[in-house]
Amino acid sequence: FLLCSFLMIILYPVGIDLYLVAVPQIAQTLQASEAQIHTAFSIYLFGMAATVLLGGIIADRHGRRWVVLGGALIFVIASLVAANATGISQFYLGRFGQGAGAGALYIMTFTVLRDVLSQARLAMALSMINGVICVIPVLAPVLGYLILSRFDWRGIFVAMALVAAVSGLVNLLLLKETRPARQQSGATRPLALLGSPRFMLHSLLTSASVTAILVYVSVSPLILMQGLGFTTEQYAIVMMVMAGVSM
């Protein structure tokens, strides 16, 4: 289950961090403005947010595997749509689909682990998952640079599709259905959490910290590479160092 969970969770940071070194090239190819590139980043996050709640509801009713495999398939297709984009609108569509697929697998990572592990082992597993989330931002800019040194920016999105395909295939072969035969009380009322002060407080604190990170990630490619003249290699090194420090 840990291997399956690792392969589920990596799509979320891969979809954010792998393509950052190519942002100026994408903007030039698609003749997109700085605002449009930032919008594409926001659309990815909106796709994630839209499917986190929906994915949980579907998983509770129809099973975890359907959401995992469906999310991986959506991510593959969306990555290829983005890779073949000829205009910013098609790129937006691909990014939204990537976010939707990543969001489905993101929520299923924690759902599956909660289904099969005790509280003590769950805490340990979540620490390991957090380690994976921290490592990806260190490696992704470098991997993106290596891909960009051989291909154009479209190759990065093909690589994303391959990662999602591997994730989907491994989960298809190894992941067993973990949905409990009897749902816990309140499982069918996900919106009830919005009335919990503790949940809302934790959500706001987490959102504030994540927002700061995502704002930096969103604006840094254009500021450093276009504004300050950093090369893709220099930008990849800066991102790797910053991610390493944050760990």
Region annotations inferred by a language model:
Residues 94-133:
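Cytoplasmic helix-loop-helix junction between adjacent transmembrane helices
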Residues 17, 45-53, 137-138, 243-247:
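Residue-level signature of mid-helix packing/kink "hotspots" within the transmembrane helices
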Residues 90, 119-120, 124-173:
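Helix-loop-helix hairpin linking two adjacent transmembrane segments in secondary transporters
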Residues 29-31, 63, 84-90, 101, ...:
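Helix-breaking motifs and short loop linkers at transmembrane-helix boundaries and internal kinks
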Residues 89-95, 201-202:
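Short hydrophobic/alpha-helical segments at membrane-entry points of transmembrane helices
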Residues 178-202:
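Juxtamembrane intracellular "pre-TM" segments in multi-pass secondary transporters
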Residues 1-34, 216-221:
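Extracytoplasmic
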Residues 50-89:
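Conserved MFS/SLC helix-loop-helix module at the cytosolic interface between two early adjacent transmembrane helices
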